[in-house]
């Protein structure tokens, strides 16, 4: 069987690939994840996903390498992972009662070519109270997640509805990713 590598240390992406019953290994890429303001959100996540995959694929050229990057976009503003609890609260206030998009760029590099795509999911939040925001932040859950929330955790209670791929919001559009890996011959 050809080697499949996830170029990410994200526990959520690992869990999703395990859900798909794929045999893979994890080799986190250590790249500068700075998003340049001149890029559109779509270009930024695609470029970061490619850089992550390329950093690993350069050392494993005969393997299939998956890189991914996820951001939350609200009114053309990219919301990455909050650096402080105050920043997390500000992000959640922004998203409260509003719709936003979750974008995941995926790069699959293989000996048979590559697949690069961006998946977009629209998420609608209920109005959040300050108590809900602070109780959620106190769990520590939002601190390692783009947009300061994890739809698969307690923040599921904030979500009114979504349009698109649920797993994309978690961190990897699973169905499309698996189909692309197989299309490339894995």
Swiss-Prot record:
The record marks 12, 70, 152 as: Important for substrate specificity. HAMAP family: Maf. Keywords: Cytoplasm, Hydrolase, Nucleotide metabolism. InterPro entries: ITPase-like_fam, Maf-like. Its main location: cytoplasm. One of its GO terms (molecular function) is UTP diphosphatase activity. It comes from Geobacillus sp. (strain WCH70). It is found in: Cytoplasm. GO terms for cellular component: cytoplasm. This is dTTP/UTP pyrophosphatase. PANTHER family: BIFUNCTIONAL DTTP/UTP PYROPHOSPHATASE/METHYLTRANSFERASE PROTEIN-RELATED, BIFUNCTIONAL DTTP_UTP PYROPHOSPHATASE_METHYLTRANSFERASE PROTEIN-RELATED. The gene is maf. It comes from the Bacteria. The active site is at residue 69. Belongs to the Maf family. YhdE subfamily.
